[in-house]
Amino acid sequence: SECLVGSEMCIRDSIKVRRFVRYEGVCSAYVHGGGTHGILVNFETTNGIEAKDEFATYGKDIAMQVAAANPGYVDEASVPAEVVAKEKEIMLAQMAGDPKTANKPEAVKQKMIEGKIKKFFKENCLVDQEFVKDGDLTVAQYTAKVAKDLGGDIKIVKFTRFQKGEGLEKRADDFAAEVASMVK
């Protein structure tokens, strides 16, 4: 609160905090593209490796990954069962509507769905994604490599990605009513 008041006095404008997140423990923050995205990633570490400069670089790399790839979840375990069920339902409907797959045996369809669900996890789970700075590694492999190099363990616990303007309601004013209210 005091920080906001001080900032308001300095820039002479009202500041309203519309959304925020607070994590305990080891975190890395990153602001991307002139403020278009803000990312906060929370980690669990061992052996005090979070104090090393290499960990700060690693944390920024992971936050940049979140900014670039926009994952929805940390790992497969964090994906709600309802989301997986809904994805399977969509895939079954697509197969039923496709003449190439509609007449395939149920066992074949289930294998196809398993493959598509693995692809869904690879695209939507941070640790399963291809690491943007090195396409030969996944984020999990990069994390394991950095942890080994630093002599400890690293676990990505959670992350938050804010996008500029996200969640802000646009006011829809009736121009005629606005003019009428000014005239009165």
Q: How would you describe each model-predicted region?
A:
Residues 1, 7-184:
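N-terminal assembly/interaction segments in proteins that build large macromolecular machines
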